[in-house]
């Protein structure tokens, strides 16, 4: 515990909590401070000027990060027949219909992302209380209810990241690993930020992107100047 506390304290040295850093400087500093014995996840958080309690201020979507996430994603697909075969051929880890629903209802969730064909949704709908709180319920708005199961599986395994604003108006995601080079992390952060900006809801008024911060699993958070994150 003492070693961990010492490492955390050291990682905060030279960090000005009041400063707005440029993206390039922030990424460099975060990488330098990611000194844990595992490959730390780099996460970006955006505080938005929305109130998600109102339907016209909900922010959600999916973005394909250009350099992937650096993590292995297990994908489950609810499908039958030819579509089930397509999912398996595309690399899905778990494929099934009624039997898969029973497995999930029994509490076994051995996957990170869930895809379904439209005809399966009446069946998958029974899993709302199980998958919903985990953010894994298939949804056509983010491409996880689709007939193109092969494309969805490949996207999920290739760096697709879903995002959804939380109650406090914050949207966040893991966008890579500390082992990524700085350019790859910057490109991923910009891709994520642009997707969130493009998902601006009609009900959002005033300043949409209020604050942006980047951090590693065990490192400090650095505030970023929002003007430096957009690729547009």
Curated annotation (Swiss-Prot):
PROSITE patterns: RIBOSOMAL_L1. The keyword Ribosomal protein applies. GO terms for cellular component: cytosolic large ribosomal subunit. It comes from the Bacteria. NCBIfam families: rplA_bact. Belongs to the universal ribosomal protein uL1 family. Part of the 50S ribosomal subunit. HAMAP family: Ribosomal_uL1_B. This is Large ribosomal subunit protein uL1. It comes from Sinorhizobium medicae (strain WSM419) (Ensifer medicae).
């Amino acid at each position: 515990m003492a070693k961990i506390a010492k490492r955390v304290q050291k990682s905060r040295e030279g960090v000005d909590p009041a400063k707005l850093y440029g993206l390039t400087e922030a990424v460099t500093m975060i990488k330098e401070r990611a000194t844990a014995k595992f490959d730390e996840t780099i996460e970006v958080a955006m505080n938005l000027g929305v109130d998600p309690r109102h339907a016209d201020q909900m922010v959600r979507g999916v973005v394909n990060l250009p350099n992937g996430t650096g993590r292995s994603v297990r994908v489950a697909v609810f499908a039958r027949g030819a579509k089930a075969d397509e999912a398996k051929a595309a690399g899905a880890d778990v494929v099934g219909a009624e039997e898969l629903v029973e497995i999930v209802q029994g509490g076994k969730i051995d996957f990170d992302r869930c895809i379904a064909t439209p005809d399966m949704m009446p069946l998958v709908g029974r899993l709302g209380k199980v998958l919903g709180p985990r953010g894994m319920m298939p949804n056509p708005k983010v491409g996880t209810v689709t007939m193109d199961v092969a494309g969805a599986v490949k996207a999920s395994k290739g760096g697709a990241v879903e995002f959804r604003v939380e109650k406090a108006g914050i949207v966040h995601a893991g966008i890579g690993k500390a082992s990524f080079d700085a350019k790859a992390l910057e490109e991923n952060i910009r891709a994520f930020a642009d997707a969130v900006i493009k998902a601006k809801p009609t009900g959002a008024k005033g300043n949409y992107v209020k604050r942006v911060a980047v951090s590693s699993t065990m490192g400090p958070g650095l505030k970023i100047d929002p003007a430096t994150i957009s690729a547009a």
